[in-house]
């Protein structure tokens, strides 16, 4: 059923906020086009990972090719490129959108437009995609279809007068969505020449066949035996197989302009394939690559250590396997005096970090412990050298620092209007600046904030959700680096610095953070036979201190009455013993203490 007429091809993706019904709508489209037999159907069919099904989110971009006979009697090839909806995966979304000519915007009739769908719609509009608004879950009691129509028009600026109402769960109105795709989404453009240009929008590692590259052919054709070249990495390969997703892989003779599918070329190293790269032929290369390619760099860093030191090799293998399918994950080996050997990992954002942690524990059964997440700070030293630091252990000598800069982000926050005061307080507490407040409708506001990235990577989302009873949403994009007073807060246990507890903080928050950590450690470190001071210090100055009391032993218990000097002698002896013990004694910090300190937060 491999028809090739450019006018009969439609490439589109679905944009939606988490839980607005994107994967369910994809399921209904697969059913309606008979792409998947009814017996093979399961919920969220395109979300392969258990984690995706459980969290109800899409992490990888999954394409699928469907064939559909329209009301005009013609058969169309419809390619759906499913995109991740979360802010951490914005670059993956932008590459998936670059492979499309149109996008369906799915909005929940009960919740209305949310921050992350707004961000992705802007990405689609920048690419000049045709956007088809669809209002989902119209059969819910809380559905307000007219209100949501007005919101789409006011907030996003799209004409929603003919937005389709549907219920992806029951299948109501889904046929109308398919017909609208045929009429509203334009077919792929005629290529200007026959040179091969194929956009890489995702890849997947297969243990037996190497890297499977997901591509959209823009011009030319790619078939088995083609000798190809990756334009960004300059690597050459021979194509062993090309095919389409229906939604399982199905080999085909060739992929032609406008088509979406996969390519296998015996690529053994995943880093040879970059998302956003252009594939061309070695013999007749395209003069220029497709626009928009950029190398993604991690934003948030954290140390990962195995709780059981013998599992270090297992952790190395686990991270290596995850990196095969997740090119944005950055890994370096490091060691800590408190935690032993582990890895310093870089992530695109906090959700990305959580997903990696959860996959290590779930898929590889390794219990891990992580240090507090950190961002990249820029230090300008007296000799003009600029140093980037993401780990408190690499903090430069304070006497040589001329200037410190930290990353700031631009943040869009959507909230019900009654929570404005509480969110403003949260913004102030996080050192944020509100630059704009817009009214979306009678009940909701859109706030634009500038915030330091360091302040939002730990608990900003949790606090936003708890203040707004779950109705607030936010997304952010990198803005710029700005000078800031970032200092190293050192935590000492029994006068010894413990690197795993130390962190980089803003000067205004150092004291309160130090107090919180010290108070937490007093609760979780067990009593010793001698007094243990716990201190938070900046440079040489102690800003917070707590003391773990010593276990007291009654050395005079065996003295019945008698002379006081006898008791004094025993007390003095005990005092000397404790002093000596304090000098040579080591404090064992239990593993749970590290977990608790991470939760100590602000």
UniProtKB/Swiss-Prot annotation:
**Recorded name of the encoding gene:** lepA
Q: What is its EC number?
A: 3.6.5.n1
Q: What job does this protein perform?
A: Required for accurate and efficient protein synthesis under certain stress conditions. May act as a fidelity factor of the translation reaction, by catalyzing a one-codon backward translocation of tRNAs on improperly translocated ribosomes. Back-translocation proceeds from a post-translocation (POST) complex to a pre-translocation (PRE) complex, thus giving elongation factor G a second chance to translocate the tRNAs correctly. Binds to ribosomes in a GTP-dependent manner.
Q: What is its main location?
A: membrane
Q: Which residues form the tr-type G domain?
A: 7-189
Q: Which family does it belong to?
A: Belongs to the TRAFAC class translation factor GTPase superfamily. Classic translation factor GTPase family. LepA subfamily.
What NCBIfam families has UniProt attached to this entry?
A: lepA, small_GTP
A single GO BP: positive regulation of translation
Annotated GO molecular function terms are: GTP binding; GTPase activity; ribosome binding; translation elongation factor activity
Record-linked CDD domains: EF4_II, EF4_III, LepA, lepA_C
- Please provide, in alphabetical order, the Gene Ontology terms of the cellular component aspect for this entry: plasma membrane
Q: Which residues form a coiled coil?
A: none
Per UniProt, subcellular location reads as: Cell inner membrane
Name of the protein described by the UniProt record? Elongation factor 4
The topology of this chain with respect to the membrane is: Peripheral membrane protein
**UniProt: GTP binding residues:** 19-24, 136-139
Q: Which reaction does it catalyse?
A: GTP + H2O = GDP + phosphate + H(+)
Key words of the record: Cell inner membrane, Cell membrane, GTP-binding, Hydrolase, Membrane, Nucleotide-binding, Protein biosynthesis
Q: Which Pfam families match?
A: EFG_C, GTP_EFTU, GTP_EFTU_D2, LepA_C
